[in-house]
Regions:
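Phosphate-binding loop of NTP-binding sites
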Residues: 2-7, 25-31, 48, 61-65, ...
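Nucleotide phosphate-binding/pyrophosphate-handling subdomain across enzymes
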Residues: 2-10, 18, 22-29, 250, ...
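Conserved N-terminal Rossmann-fold NAD(P)-binding element of oxidoreductases
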Residues: 9-14, 431
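NAD(P)-binding Rossmann-fold cofactor-contacting core
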Residues: 30-46
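Beta-strand->loop->alpha-helix junctions that form or flank phosphate-binding loops
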Residues: 36-37, 55-58, 94-98, 139-141, ...
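Short acidic low-complexity segments
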Residues: 53-66, 411-419
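C-terminal helical cap/extension that packs against the catalytic core
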Residues: 369-426
């Protein structure tokens, strides 16, 4: 994979956050990059602006036989006409995860896994290494605000490569990291794994991929087992622990101490919530293992701007604050809303939530109801299906009936702006992993007016 210049690479499902990062990587490496996605989006438009040709029609007549390699996302359906054409013409087809696996073996790599928190940790590690001057490449599962991108493309002199490790369809088992990080293991993707026990087993298989001279870093509460060198982090009973957590001057501040009582100093950041202190700890420990000076780590963390759609404060004035967040699992919702309450304890919280996947809504119906009941007002959108077909009896209306907050309603997409306007929110949060992000600019404009 390190000798790729001038190859012609086609991406099936180029508009996904992970696929677009790979597309940008190979494009900047000098490859001819083009691809297909089902729908146009702000991200695909940016790729086109960068010189990448994208088709929005599953039409084999748009393809040419000089394509050297096809990289596909697991979201592409098996009956895709373009996929079948590539198979018929015996053009090499590989999965995104397999390509990342090859790249992870080019140099020392840091792989960040977890059902929640992995994008933020990946982005923090990337920023801290970049700030310290390390020669590096990075693949992030979101748009990091410091670089306004989801990728950093280095060169053959890279000292380290950082990548987000996706547990969906066991993709992360293709990686060979020097440092592996596990942030969380909560039941999710049960349509793939069947039960939580299988999910835990898969995470431990990922950890086992860590090189023999490498290190495993993980949340001390997790059921991780490894014979590699390992370090844990948390608020208690861990190798590294956070102390004196507080918010001062709109910054989160905390100190770190080892289990032996050694103080590692004070840190501050623009992120909020205990979950983000945990995320910062994982990133700090990884960078320290890579011999980054603690002064650079401390300064870098203070300048980290966050990731788009991760507790993303989009608008704030004297009357209203608007936060957009990617949370789509009950535990993520709880953590995010807890952070919101911590910062704005007296404001009435209006939550707009778009459930993501019928299977996830089915598997965690009661947990979603409990988490969403934290809102004062709830505007619940219809379930975003993504790759799935509807499941009988699994609807937003069924979920709404289980939610205990007094003011709650179902809202269709074409009603959303009017409903928000009529609710006159003082603290508005939008959440979800579907297409709710497409409403964010319009909501910003509405609140500004």
């Amino acid at each position: 994979m390190n000798k790729v210049a001038k190859r012609k690479i086609y991406f099936l499902g180029i508009g996904g956050i992970g696929m677009s990062a790979l597309a940008r990587y190979f494009h900047k490496k000098g490859c001819v990059v083009l691809g297909y996605d089902k729908t146009e989006s702000p991200l695909t438009r940016k790729l086109e602006d960068e010189g990448i040709l994208i088709h929005y029609e599953d039409n084999p007549n748009l393809l040419s036989d000089d394509i050297d390699l096809v990289i596909m996302t697991p979201a592409i359906p098996k009956d895709s006409l373009q996929l079948q054409w590539f198979k018929d013409n015996k053009i090499r087809i590989t999965k995104r995860a397999e390509v990342l696996g090859e790249l992870s073996r080019l140099t020392k790599s840091v792989a960040v896994a977890g059902t929640h928190g992995k994008t933020t940790v990946t982005a923090i590690v990337t920023h801290l290494l970049n700030y310290s001057g390390k020669r590096m490449s990075a693949f992030i599962g979101g748009i990091a605000k410091n670089i306004n991108s989801n990728v950093i493309v280095g060169d053959e002199n890279d000292e380290v490569m950082v990548m987000e490790a996706d547990e969906f369809d066991r993709s992360f088992l293709h990686l060979s990291p020097y440092i592996s990080i596990v942030t969380s293991i909560d039941a999710d993707h049960l349509d793939i794994y069947g039960d939580e026990q299988e999910l835990v087993k898969s995470f431990n298989e990922f950890v086992a991929k860590t090189s023999e001279n490498g290190v495993v870093i993980y949340n001390h509460k997790l059921p991780v087992t490894t014979d590699r060198k390992h370090l844990t982090y948390g608020f208690e009973d861990a190798d590294v622990m956070a102390r004196n957590l507080r918010i001062e001057n709109a910054l989160t501040k905390f100190s770190l101490v080892t289990k032996e009582g050694l103080g590692l100093g004070e840190f501050e950041m623009r992120l909020y919530g205990k979950h983000n202190v945990m995320n910062a700890m994982a990133a700090i420990m990884a960078c320290f293992q890579l011999k980054i000076d603690m002064k650079d780590i401390r300064e870098g963390l203070a300048t980290f701007k966050g990731v788009q759609r991760r507790f993303d404060i989009r608008y704030k004035d004297d009357e209203v604050c608007y936060i957009d967040d990617y949370a789509h699992h009950p535990e993520e919702i709880k953590a995010s809303l807890s952070a919101v309450r911590e910062i704005f304890p007296t404001k009435e919280l209006t939550l707009v939530f778009q459930p993501h996947l019928f299977t996830r809504t089915r598997d965690f119906m009661d947990e979603f109801a409990d988490a969403l009941s934290q809102a004062d007002k709830l505007i619940l959108m219809e379930i975003y299906p993504a790759r799935e077909k509807p499941i009988s009896g699994i609807t937003s209306s069924v979920l709404l009936d289980k939610i205990s907050c007094k003011q709650k309603q179902i809202c269709q997409k074409d009603e959303l702006l009017d409903v928000i306007q009529s609710s006159r929110p003082e603290l508005l949060v939008t959440m979800g992993a579907g297409d709710i992000d497409r409403f964010v600019p319009s909501i910003e404009m509405l609140l500004q007016s």
